[in-house]
Regions:
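Gly/Ala-rich beta-loop-alpha elbow adjacent to hydrolase catalytic centers
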Residues: 144-153
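Bacterial N-terminal signal peptides
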Residues: 7-16
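N-terminal cap/lid segment of alpha/beta-hydrolase-fold proteins
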Residues: 22-61
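Short, surface-exposed "cap/lid" segments of acyl-processing enzymes
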Residues: 52, 60-95, 99
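A conserved short beta-strand
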Residues: 162-169
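Alpha/beta-hydrolase active-site loop
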Residues: 112-136
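Positively charged n-region of N-terminal signal peptides that target proteins for export
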Residues: 1-6
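Short beta-to-alpha linker loops that shape the active-site pocket of alpha/beta-hydrolase fold enzymes
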Residues: 74, 102-107
Length: 169
């Protein structure tokens, strides 16, 4: 029995040592690369309680007191030109303010399953975005996720009590 206990202790220690955290240096490189290229919206820094992360807020043409938090896919950023930028800008034509946020990311060679340990970082980021929007007076808040952002949004909703009014993923 003592042998099993020792093995479990060693395994628990090994898993703890291998736990990954978001690649904050890569996040900063993305932020530096895109900050001056934003044509629609304003960049901002949000804080998840441990670190600052990039957000891009874009006001709707018509002020309808509703906002969408947009979450990108694996390894990219909150202004990804192929999907996220058209979504965050296009929704403003339909009365939605958008806040596209930097989700936790890993190095370029990381595969999809390697992201699982980062899911603990998801709730603080989404909560920071929700809190910002509430402080700005938005009452109706929805989450929209693409690819890994969809999975992270699903994980968030399954594990957190929230008053967001919708989810598209």
């Amino acid at each position: 029995m003592k042998t099993i206990s020792n093995i479990l202790t060693i395994l628990a220690f090994a898993f703890t040592c291998n736990a990954q955290a978001s690649d904050l240096a890569k996040e900063q490189r993305w932020a530096d690369a895109i900050e001056d290229t934003i044509m629609d919206g304003e960049t901002m820094l949000l804080n998840d309680g441990k670190s600052d992360f990039l957000g891009i807020f874009t006001e709707a043409i018509e002020d309808k007191n509703r906002a969408a938090i947009i979450m990108h896919g694996t390894g990219i950023h909150p202004d990804w030109q192929q999907v996220i930028n058209p979504l965050r800008v296009g929704l403003t034509d339909h009365g939605w303010h958008t806040l596209s946020i930097q989700m936790p990311i890993l190095a370029n060679d990381a595969e999809y399953p390697a992201y699982a340990p980062l899911y603990d970082e998801v709730a603080p980021r989404i909560n920071a975005a929700i809190n910002y929007l509430k402080e700005e007076g938005y009452k109706k808040i929805v989450l929209i996720g693409h690819s890994q952002g969809s999975t992270m949004g699903t994980y968030y909703l399954a594990n957190n009590k929230t008053d967001v009014t919708g989810f598209v993923g």
